[in-house]
């Protein structure tokens, strides 16, 4: 079977489950180019990694607790399925993982509790780090637009703790191999359509 990426990520999983059409456009055809919001989020992550930065980034840093690891790049395997993910923040001593989100609209508890990305990261932590996170956090950073449409951080932030049960983690671990199989089969069919339409 053909896979657009040699691994499964949280974003792939979410996109495929939401819309196969969007998955094909994004990962098979490469038609997703991002937007100013995703680009701004990437910029914030990059700025937080620098030893020195702007005043607003320093304000943000003070709002986020200390973590032993930042931008932890994980590549692991679950029942033959290669999994990849970037966990923004990890505190190994306290068993904590966290993700940074930027948006104009405030991140809610409900959204945090239903975000499958966090469950996926719990799976990665179990497989790669060897432990199940005791706590999961979302660090939300508020953004706004100036008169020219440029995004900036307001300095307002919010930290949300969200829990994941063993059942939620185990259910996703059971689902991942099934979704991986479905992705391969769906991509094979889509490629056949593309090839037949070009003949």
Predicted regions and their residues:
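Metal-dependent nuclease catalytic regions and adjoining charged, substrate-binding loops involved
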Residues: 7-8, 79, 126-199
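Conserved aromatic-histidine-acidic binding/catalytic patches
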Residues: 32, 36, 108-113, 164
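Non-catalytic protein-protein interaction segments used by genome-maintenance enzymes to assemble
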Residues: 75-118, 123
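Hydrophobic/aromatic-lined pockets within catalytic cores
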Residues: 29, 52, 102, 126-130, ...
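Residue-level signal for well-ordered alpha-helical scaffold segments within enzymatic catalytic domains
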Residues: 26, 46, 96, 120-127
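Short, solvent-exposed loop/turn segments at secondary-structure junctions
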Residues: 30, 103-105, 142-145
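Short acidic (Asp/Glu) and glycine-rich catalytic loops that position anionic groups and cofactors
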Residues: 21-28, 98-102, 152-158
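Metal-dependent nuclease catalytic cores that hydrolyze phosphodiester bonds in DNA/RNA
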Residues: 1-92
């Amino acid at each position: 079977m053909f896979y657009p990426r040699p691994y499964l990520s949280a974003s792939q999983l979410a996109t495929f489950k939401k819309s196969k059409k969007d998955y094909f456009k994004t990962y098979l055809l490469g038609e997703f180019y991002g937007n100013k919001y995703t680009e701004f989020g990437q910029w914030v992550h990059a700025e937080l990694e620098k030893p020195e930065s702007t005043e607003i980034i320093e304000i943000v840093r003070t709002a986020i607790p200390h973590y032993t690891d930042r931008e932890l790049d994980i590549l692991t395997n679950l029942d033959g399925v290669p999994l990849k993910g970037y966990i923004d923040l990890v505190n190994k001593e306290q068993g904590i993982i966290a993700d940074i989100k930027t948006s104009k609209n405030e991140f809610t508890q409900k959204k945090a509790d239903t975000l499958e990305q966090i469950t996926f990261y719990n799976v990665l932590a179990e497989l790669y780090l060897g432990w199940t996170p005791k706590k999961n956090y979302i660090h939300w950073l508020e953004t706004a637009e100036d008169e020219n449409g440029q995004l900036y951080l307001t300095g307002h932030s919010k930290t949300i703790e969200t829990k994941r049960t063993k059942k939620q983690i185990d259910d996703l671990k059971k689902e991942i191999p099934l979704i991986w199989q479905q992705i391969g089969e769906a991509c094979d069919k889509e490629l056949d359509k593309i090839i037949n339409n070009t003949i």
